[in-house]
Design a protein with these regions (language model features):
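C-terminal structural segments of small proteins and small subunits
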Residues: 65-90
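Short S/T/G/P-rich N-terminal loop/turn motif that feeds into the first structured element of a domain
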Residues: 1-53, 60-70, 93-95
Length: 95
């Protein structure tokens, strides 16, 4: 069963760091067969916090999604964001 990273950004303090993260994260995600379904774009908040950016990445299965997040390659990219964004990142299994 496929799995997804669902990332809801609450606050972005440094757009340049976000770009740097994206450049480094993309090959790490692709290494684990991750496919971007949503990256930014127009959105409407119906409930909860207004989000300046949303990202959804599809993986072949839950374990692969977890392995990617925990990988050295992705964590190196993730560290670029520390102190520059507030986001909610979940790994969910779905159909």
């Amino acid at each position: 069963m496929k799995a997804y990273w669902v990332c809801v950004y609450e606050k972005i303090d440094n757009a340049e760091k976000l770009k740097e993260y994206a450049v480094k994260a993309k090959p790490a995600i692709e290494k684990f067969s991750g496919k971007f379904l949503v990256r930014g774009g127009k959105n409407r908040t119906n409930d909860g916090i207004d989000s300046p950016r949303n990202v959804v990445v599809e993986f072949p299965d839950y374990n692969t999604a977890v392995e990617c997040y925990d990988s050295k390659e992705y964590q190196e990219a993730h560290n670029i964001l520390k102190g520059h964004v507030v986001r909610h990142h979940q790994i969910v299994e779905g159909g």
